[in-house]
């Protein structure tokens, strides 16, 4: 998606002199018009390409012609929590600390979800904007992100579509969301969950007009439907409809994704899985190594807790380099790295990953033990994410950005930079 328009040498990006906000070693201009940043969960760029080409996204077609369209890299592991937090902090996991949906807490010796703000090591831009006196609203599809995205958000609105029936003024900054949006509570396993996010965002912009709004969807559709299929095109047509209405209200819109999505099956259509816990048990004895799958969250029906990234804790007598060398001999493994190598390559907090990191190839996922994964909920060929093969994501702004260096490596966590510093 190349950038359209004629870059002007007279256009200058915002500089520290006219910026009012400094967060995580980056500077931002304060919003002068409503800014909406959208994270479309699982949005492989081809979803947009197919939907636009087949006439399902007229608004997006116009934006790509007149605005800014880039392909960026998200962070690895290509999962929801680390990338959403990268977007709202403007920084990689090595700065904000959220390295997965799930981790092994070595201090307590337990495996835990990374939903608690205690794991966050950096302030969010959303909280900083609220502290600067700006009206901030956050709507996320799944409630697992709400506390992280809303951390230290003073006076703002922050709720999830999943639990929109439980909103309270004192907790979420708003109440009676179902009545206000005039939609029923959606199922967490449906496209309706994401549509509720967009409908809520549109209602908030019409009735509260926040200065900055962050919308984060769910990838239920992307896990089930490939780009260009009727199910996928219907989802993106719905999204296009809401984004067009937000645009008509005068919003600067920056759209990106937390990760892409790929089929993870063999030619027979069956899931192509490397069960790492079984592999390590066979190599070095049962239970001596601990495999952690950072994709793990409460919503496993559509992916079976199978993703393309894993981290492994080894006993002292097992050399990390030896383990990596053996893994690299296995078909389906793209890369196996020691802790130090993985932290440097993927910008991860070294103290929150195992002794080694394993990333599988595009059509392969990583599991723990075969007996621990229930794939009975899969009613379509497995599609998932987590690896390097899901790193490419769209980065789109509904405004031209003359002077922008489109040749540099852009990241999904540059979304607020583009919206606040270039598009206004």
Predicted segments — roles?
Residues 11, 16-18, 88-226, 232, ...:
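His/Asp/Glu-rich, glycine-adjacent segments
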Residues 14-68:
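Active-site-proximal N-terminal segment of extracellular/periplasmic enzymes that hydrolyze or transfer
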Residues 32-49, 63, 87, 129, ...:
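Beta-strand elements within well-structured catalytic alpha/beta cores of enzymes
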Residues 33, 40, 78-79, 102-116, ...:
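Secreted, luminal/periplasmic, and some membrane-associated catalytic domains
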Residues 42-46, 65-71, 79-83, 101-114, ...:
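Glycine-/proline-rich flexible loop or hinge segments
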Residues 42-45, 77-78, 93, 142-146, ...:
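Short, solvent-exposed loop/turn segments at secondary-structure junctions
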Residues 49-90, 137:
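Short, structured active-site-proximal loop/turn typified by the sulfatase FGly-forming signature C/S-X-P-X-R
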Residues 360-421:
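Low-complexity, glycine/alanine/valine/leucine- and proline-rich hydrophobic stretches
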